[in-house]
Amino acid sequence: MEEMPKNYDPQAAEPELIEKWMKADCYGRSKGTEDRTVVIPPPNVTGILHMGHAMDDTIQDTYIRYSRMRGYSTRWILGTDHAGIATQTKVDKKLKSEGISRLEIGREKFLDACWDWTREYGGTIVSQIKRMGCSIDFNDEKFTMSPEYTQAVRKVFVDWYHDQLIYRGKRIVNWCPHCETSISDDEAEYADEKGHLWYLRYPLKEPVNGVEYITVATTRPETMLGDTGVAVSPQDPEKADLVGKTVILPIVDREIPIFSDWHVDAGFGTGFVKVTPAHDPNDFAMGQTHNLEQINIFDEHAVVVDGYGEFSGLDRDQAREAIVAWFEEHGLLDHVEDLDHSVMHCYRCGTTLEPWLSEQWFVAVDKLKEPAAQVVKDGQVTFHPERWTQTYLTWMENLRDWNISRQLWWGHRIPVFYCDDCGWQDALMEDTDVCPKCGGHHVHQDEDVLDTWFSSQLWTFATQGWPDHPEQLEGHHPTQVLVTARDIIALWVARMIMSSLYFTKEIPFHDVYIYATILAKDGSRMSKSKGNGVDPMDLIAKYGADAMRYNLLTLITNNQDVKFDAVLDKKTRELIESPRTDQARSFVTKIWNASRFVQMNLDGYTAGMPKAETPEDAWMFSRLAKVVAETTEQLETYGFGEYARNIQSFFWNDVCDWYIELCKGRLLDGTPDQRLQVQRNLVFVLDVSMRLLHPAMPFVTESVWDALPASGLLSHDAEFLMISEWPDPEKLASFVDEAAEHNFSLAKTVVSAVRSSRARYRLSPKTDLAVVVKAPAQDVAALKEQAAFIQNVGRVSSLEVAEAPQKPAGSVSVTDAGLEMYVVLGELVDLAAEAKRLQKDLESAKKELSGVERTLANQGFVAKAAPEVIEKKRARAEELTTLVAQLEQQIADFS
C-alpha cells in the first residue's frame, strides 16, 4: 500500500482527478431503476462564473453525486444561453473599437461576428464549471441557438400564434434607448432616486367660476408635449365642475379634455393628473378607456421627434430642462418640490428606461397562467423553502401579457412573414420567399427577435429531443428539481411551467429549490460596477474547489440572503482572503491528516467486518449509523446546509477528536488481534465517512478513498468513489445503540469538563486532577463502569461518582448534560485571586455592553449610521452578552 503524501495539494490533485473521471466516463448517464434528471440553468454563453453560479452548481452537483451513489439513473444536462442583449452588446462594442458599426456591415455579417464571438469565448464558463468538479455530461452540451433547439423555439411560437396566444399590438413597453430594444417588466431593475415634482399650470379654454387654469403635478415635465388629457378622481367633488371642460396645452396649443378616472389618486399633487397615453402604462389604460389620442414624442433614442419646434432634437434630459425653463419664463411654473421616487433601469446597461408606445409581439397569458398556478397549489410542483410558493402565486395573479419581441439581431428571429403585395401574414415553420396567397415574391420576415426567456422557457424538454423525438423524454421528464435564484421565479420558473404544461402536458420539474442570494461582506449586492464581486476561480486557486464548495454549502440556511466574507484589495479588487473558505480548507486538511494517520498504521491489515469491542466502538458505530440516516434524509429533502454542517461536526468532533484519538492505544500498543480489529473498525468508519462527505467535497474524498483498502462491510469494487454505493441507512440501522451512546456521552462530558477546566485556568494538559461527579441515579452505574476510561483519557487522578456527593474544598463546578462536576484545583490555582480577576473582567464587560446597547437604542444613530456599522455594533453586543454569561458562570463555579 503506497503511503499517502504528507500534504494534500488541491491544485495538483483536483485537475488530475477531473481528467481521470472524464476518461472513465463517470460523468455520463448512470444506470438505475429510477430516474433523476436535472437541467442546469443555462449561463450566458460568453459569460464567466460568478458566486451565484458557484452556489447553484455546487448544490446541483452535490445532489447529482448523492443520487448517483444512491443508485438512481442520473442525468445532469449542461447547456448555455445565447444571451441576446448581452452578446449583441459585447459584439457591438468590439466592432466599435475597430471603427465599424453593425448598421454598416448589415445583419448577416453581424450575425457571423456574433457566432465568431460565441465560438471564441463560449467555452470559458463551461471550463470553469468543469474546474469546480461538477460531474455533468460535458459530451452532451446544449445551446439555445443550436439547429435542434431553434426548431423547438420556432414550433412553440408558430403553435401559440395559430392558437391565438401570440398577437401583435401597440402597447407601452419599457424601452432602453441605449440598447435600442424593449425590456420586459420582470427584467427592469428599480432604483430609488432623488427627483422633483414640478407643478405646471395649464390654462382652461374658458374660465370656470373664475378659475382660469388648473395645476398638474408631474415628475416628467418633458412628456407634456404628448399630453392628450387631464384626469381627476371621481372621489374628488371639488373638481366635479371641471369634468368635461377643455384645457389648452401650453407650447403646442392642443385642446385636451378633463375627465374623471379611477386610476387617479386624489391625494397626489393637486389631484389633477396630466395624461400621456404614449409614455405611461396607467395613462395608456386611461387613454384606451376615454378614447384619447396616443402621441409618441420620442424616437428610439429618447430624442424629441420633429414637429415640436425648438424642442425637437433634444434628448429627454435636455427637453426636461428646456420645457421647465419655458414654463418658468411664461409664468406657468407654479412651484417645484423635492421627491424621492423609484425609477426603472435597464438590467444590462443601467440606462433609465423609457415607457414608450410601440408595436410589439405579446403572449396572451390568461389561458396559460391558471393551470401553471394550479399545479403549485395542488403540490405537483413544490417550492423549497416553502415561503417562495406565495411569491410565485402572487406573481401569477398579477401577470400581464408578456412582451416577447426584442429589437435586436442576435437571437431567434420571429418566424412571421409578410407579403408586401397582398397583405398576407402568417407564422411558418419554414422560411419562404413566395406568398402562398398571391404567389408574389415581395415577402419579408419580421425584423425582431424573441426575448431570450422565450427560448429558455423550453429548457427542460427542448434539451431532451422535443419536438422531433418526444420518446427521449420518457423517464427523464418531468425533471426532478430546478435549482435557481429567487430573481428569476417570474422570469423563468413560471414560464417554464406554463410552456411545459401546454406542450408536454406535464410539469417541467417536481421541485424548485431557491438558494439564498450571496451578498458582499458589507451586505450589498455583488456587481461589476461596484467592484465587489468575488471570482470563484480566485477562491479555487487560493483554497481549492473542495473548500469553496463546502463553504458555500455551510452558508445555506433558511435566510433569504447570506454575506460572503471575502476581503478584496481596494485598488486591484483581487482576492486577499476569505476566512470562512480558509476554515473549510482546514477541514480538507483535517480529513487528509486523519485519514493519513490511519493509513500509515495499517500494517498487517486484512479486510474484515467491523466489530464493537469497546464502549467507544459501540458509540462510534451508533453515531455513524445515525449520521448516515440523517444526511440521507437531509439530501433527499434538499437540506444542503444542514447536511454539510452535520457531516463536518460528526467527522471533525466525533471521528477525529474522539474516536481516532481513543483508538491510538489499541492501534499502537494493542495485541495483534486488537490491532487488526481496530484497523478494520477505523477503515470502516473512514470508508463510510468519505462516502458521506463525497457529494460536497469530491476531490479530497476521492483521493482518500483511493488510498484506503476495502472495508469488510461496504463494497469497494467500484473504480472510483463517485460511482460507489451510498451507505444504506437500513443496513446500518442495527448499529444504533442508544444505551451505548448515552453512557459514552456521559464519560465524554466528564472528560470535556476536566479538559476545559485545565484550559480555563491555564494548567498543563498533563496535570492530573481529582474529580467528583454528581449524577442522576440512573447514570451513576454507567459512569462507574467507565471510570478507568475517564481516568485514563481525562488524566483524572481520582474519580468519585454519587447522587449527592459533598463538594470538595478548593474545587470549581462545571454543569453540563445533567451532570455537576467538581474539579479539584486545590493549590494549583489561587481561587481568591482568580475570582477577583473574573469579577473585574465581568464589570468591564457589563460596562461596555451597556454602552453598546445605549447606542443601538438611539434612533438617531440607527437612522443615520451605515448598515455595516450597525451590524458590527449588534455583533459586538452579542459577543459581550455571551462573555458576561460565561464570566458569571465561571464566578459561580467558585461558590
Set out the residue ranges of the language-model regions.
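N-terminal, positively charged nucleic-acid-binding surface of large information/translation enzymes
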Residues: M1-Q235, F259, T276-T289, E293-Y308, ...
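Conserved short loop/turn motifs at secondary-structure junctions
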Residues: P5-K6, G79-H82, F110-W115, N139-T150, ...
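Active-site-adjacent bridging/hinge elements
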Residues: G32-I40, T62, E98-S101, V126-G133, ...
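Structured ligand/cofactor/substrate-binding pocket environments in proteins
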Residues: G52-I64, G71, T80-D81, Y149-A152, ...
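Short, polar/flexible loop-turn hinges at active-site or ligand-entry regions and domain interfaces
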Residues: S97-D112, T382-F383, M537, N558-V567, ...
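Short Cys/His-rich metal-coordination motifs, predominantly Zn2+-binding knuckles/fingers
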Residues: C179, V252, C349, D420-C422, ...
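Short acidic-hydrophobic surface loop/beta-edge motif
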Residues: W198-E206, K245-P250, M344-Y347, F417, ...
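Feature 926 captures the class I aminoacyl-tRNA synthetase adenylation module centered on the KMSKS loop
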Residues: Y199, T394-F454, L458, Y502-A545, ...
